[in-house]
């Protein structure tokens, strides 16, 4: 994990080392060696490293035990990322005189941990920490990295499975591809590509690919409405692929691209799909964006939370992870810092909230890990509290920087970018099987298609999914008006009610039990035919529930009945009949009475909640009007129902 090294051996340090000796003396008395070293200092101050190294080699040749040239040579090598050569020079210094300067152990250990030499780094950090007078900042850094060494040594002994596969040339090219985003149904893949040229080093744009027969097709630019001559990055798609969040940074002229305005530095923007095309992009707003760095958004699958990374004032470190909530009026709340369990005095970035809504993946160099930016997973409990983050393990995490992880809705696959050998060029996007311990909760996606029951024309209807156990709304949104489709992610251990409404149509209700799915790996698909409001039209109240053989309304019926109240309140002149129906099991007379009482229970609820009794009637039909034959348990269940029929508009 490459990181900025704390190399304190600047010219100032060298002079301070000299000051520890008798006045006017170096660690050498060889005049030619001293002259060569002082020439090297002059070249070093002029940033002429090659001439400085030549003079340093000359000084060392004249006196191999001359410490100062070794120290300056180590710094030059380190600054030019010739890490092993820098390490060799520090080791030579310690061989000459291990007590010359305690900082030599510190700087050597920093280099060793940066290339994964954990045992060597551990030894040198321990040697450094034995000194009693240490700069507090250096001591804190050494103690943290010593903990990293201890963690890494054990992690390497206990590796997790890791076999990354290149995602293919439909997405990857000889350029850099990174920051992947994917829809919950695994059919649309969006990512960032740096379309650099000979004259432009950074030109970031978004590309999109569709999966056909299990293969990602050749990616194409997402369109001029989003991509600009500037840079767009860190994309994130809503679960259904209808909303795109991304970051854009301020250009030299102060803009964020054509017709885009911001608050300073990098801001978050969003765009919505209109049919098959993307609409105009908009700034998320001043509640979220500041004049500091905001980037790397992750939109929760329920459409209620936006996680992102910010360098704003008041955080715990260089960059922290925040979350903002979407209010009922469509505005974003003031962001909340995720707190010290997640954020550290270091850097947190590349946040991703899984569609299960409870599992958070992110990169950090502040938690104990392999030495720099590692990938971590944290989980939210039922109280909304985050667990301690867990490092997802070696060799997924290494001494290099790891970030930008994306986890599929199924939870078994993770995507990341790497410039590892064997790719198509530059950074490529790879996927791998996520270790079981790092996987999120099991979910499936629910995909619906809303249309006019007569014409089959798609409808952009409003829909809401409700947890039947808690009565709480899980997600509320609109279907795509172009194709009538919607897609949401849902935990499989719950049962849900679906309510769909559209002006001019009867509202639609359904309930389904994901707990009872035979194959939990497959999505739940549903057609939603909407009936135009006409006399004789019928709504089956599928989310009105009674105790067995009783007419007491269950508490979970309230949501549906309130929808019916709202529907009748909007359609002020509508009149209707509430009807109860049973199957053919049991005494016919008792069934007739039961159905009558159940219809009346719904009637009473509506009247109690403000609907004029003159607009309503109720009747029980027993088993006289079955929808299907009473020849199976499933069919008998369909015949046990409560309906609302329009008898006048």
Question: What name fits each language-model region?
Answer:
Residues 28, 34, 72, 79, ...:
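Short, conserved micro-motifs composed of acidic
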Residues 29-62:
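Alpha-helical segment of the N-proximal tetratricopeptide repeat
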Residues 364, 368-371, 571, 577-649:
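Periplasmic OmpA-like peptidoglycan-binding domain that tethers envelope proteins to the cell wall
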Residues 469-485:
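Short, acidic Ser/Thr/Gly-rich low-complexity loop/linker segments typical of extracellular
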Residues 484, 494-504:
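A short, solvent-exposed beta-strand micro-motif common in secreted/extracellular proteins
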Residues 503-527:
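Structured interaction patches on ligand/partner-binding surfaces of diverse proteins
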Residues 533-574, 582-590:
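Short, solvent-exposed beta-strand/turn patches at coil↔beta or beta↔helix junctions
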């Amino acid at each position: 994990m490459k990181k900025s090294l704390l190399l304190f051996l600047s010219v100032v340090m060298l002079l301070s080392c000299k000051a520890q000796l008798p006045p006017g003396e170096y660690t050498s008395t060889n005049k030619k060696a001293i002259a060569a070293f002082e020439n090297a200092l002059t070249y070093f101050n002029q940033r002429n490293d090659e001439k400085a190294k030549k003079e340093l080699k000359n000084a060392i040749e004249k006196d191999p035990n001359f410490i100062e040239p070794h120290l300056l040579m180590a710094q030059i090598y380190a600054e030019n990322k010739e890490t092993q050569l820098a390490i060799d020079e520090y080791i030579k210094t310690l061989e000459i005189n291990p007590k010359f300067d305690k900082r030599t152990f510190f700087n050597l250990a920093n280099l060793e941990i940066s290339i994964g030499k954990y045992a060597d780094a551990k030894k040198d950090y321990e040697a450094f920490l034995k000194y009693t007078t240490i700069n507090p900042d250096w001591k804190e850094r050494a103690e943290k990295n010593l903990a990293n060494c201890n963690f890494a040594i054990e992690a390497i002994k206990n590796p997790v499975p890791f076999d990354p596969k290149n995602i293919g040339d439909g997405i990857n090219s000889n350029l850099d591809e990174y920051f992947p985003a994917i829809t919950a149904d695994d059919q649309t893949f969006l990512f960032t590509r740096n379309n650099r040229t000979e004259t432009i080093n950074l030109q970031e744009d978004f590309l999109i690919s569709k999966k056909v027969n299990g293969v990602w097709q050749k990616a194409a630019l997402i369109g001029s409405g989003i991509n600009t001559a500037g840079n767009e990055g860190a994309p994130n798609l809503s679960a259904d692929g209808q909303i795109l969040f991304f970051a854009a940074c301020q250009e030299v002229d102060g803009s964020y691209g054509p017709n885009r305005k911001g608050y300073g530095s990098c801001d978050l923007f969003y765009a919505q799909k209109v049919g098959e095309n993307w609409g105009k992009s908009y700034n998320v707003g001043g509640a979220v964006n500041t004049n500091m760095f905001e980037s790397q958004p992750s939109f929760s699958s329920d459409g209620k939370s936006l996680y992102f990374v910010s360098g704003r004032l008041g955080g715990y470190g260089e960059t922290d992870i925040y979350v903002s909530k979407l209010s009922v009026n469509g505005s974003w709340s003031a962001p909340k810092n995720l707190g010290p369990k997640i954020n550290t005095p270091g850097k947190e970035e590349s946040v991703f909230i899984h569609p299960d809504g409870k599992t958070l993946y992110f990169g950090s160099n502040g938690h104990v890990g392999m030495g720099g930016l590692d990938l971590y997973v944290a989980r939210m409990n039922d109280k909304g509290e985050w667990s301690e983050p867990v490092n997802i393990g070696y060799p997924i995490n290494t001494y290099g920087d790891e970030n930008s992880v994306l986890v599929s809705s199924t939870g078994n696959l993770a995507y990341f970018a790497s410039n590892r050998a064997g790719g198509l060029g530059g950074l490529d996007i790879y996927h791998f099987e996520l270790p079981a311990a790092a996987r999120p909760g099991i979910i499936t996606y629910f995909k619906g298609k809303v249309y006019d029951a007569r014409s089959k024309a798609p409808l952009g209807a409003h829909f809401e999914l409700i947890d039947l156990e808690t009565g709480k709304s899980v997600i509320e949104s609109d279907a795509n008006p172009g194709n009538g489709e919607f897609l949401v992610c849902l935990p499989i251990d719950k049962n849900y009610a679906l309510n769909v409404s559209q002006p001019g149509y009867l509202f639609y209700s359904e309930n389904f039990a994901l707990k009872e799915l035979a194959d939990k790996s497959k999505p739940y698909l549903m057609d939603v035919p909407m009936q135009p409001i006409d006399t004789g039209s019928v709504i089956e109240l599928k989310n009105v529930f009674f105790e067995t053989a009783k007419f007491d309304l269950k508490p979970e019926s309230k949501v549906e009945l309130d929808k019916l109240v709202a529907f009748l309140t909007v359609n002020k002149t509508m009149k209707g009949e509430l009807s109860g129906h049973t199957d053919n099991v049991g005494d016919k007379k008792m069934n007739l009475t039961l159905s009558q009482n159940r219809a009346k229970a719904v009637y009473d609820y509506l009247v109690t909640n403000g609907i004029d009794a003159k607009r309503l009637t109720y009747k029980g039909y027993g088993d006289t009007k079955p929808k299907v034959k009473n020849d199976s348990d499933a069919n008998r269940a369909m015949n046990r129902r409560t309906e609302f029929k329009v008898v006048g508009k």
